[in-house]
Amino acid sequence: MKDGFIQQVGTPTEVFDMPLNLFVAEFIGAPKMNTFKTTLTVEDGKYFVNPYGVKIEVNGKKADMLTNKGVQSGEIILGVRPEHFVLSDESNPAAIPCKIVVNEMMGSELHLHVLEDNGDRLIVRIPTVSLTDEQRASLVYGSTIYVTFEGKVMHFFDPETQLNLLV
């Protein structure tokens, strides 16, 4: 509910996986969904997003849905949940460089609050079981990490209406 109006009705899974709008997307889930402005492009029938100067192909069901909805190239708000980011390395062309500003140890996972080069703050959630002791020790304030995400886990919102482009 926002401003006295119900925003979406559905099962918890439906609301989490396919939020109707940006408000619902950021409200459901902890930590909240990361959102940032970027462009969606269509090249040879394939969709790409271009956050922070990297090019990531939209794939899987999300690509099919964009095609079926007839979504065209343009400015969007891209949503990526913290658990959908993965650590990468500098050699990956889809890697986004970020500087760690907060490392929250939550027991079975780390919540890394990072700043992208242009100043956007993102939250990256990493299961501690997936890290070596060396990796864990390197994830400290001020260190640079590289993160990326798969094309099948993205959410796409209209920057004017804030509605999900796939609903």
Regions found by a protein language model. Give the residues of each.
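Internal alpha/beta loop-helix hairpins
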Residues: M1-I56
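Non-catalytic connector elements of ABC transporters
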Residues: M33, V42-V167
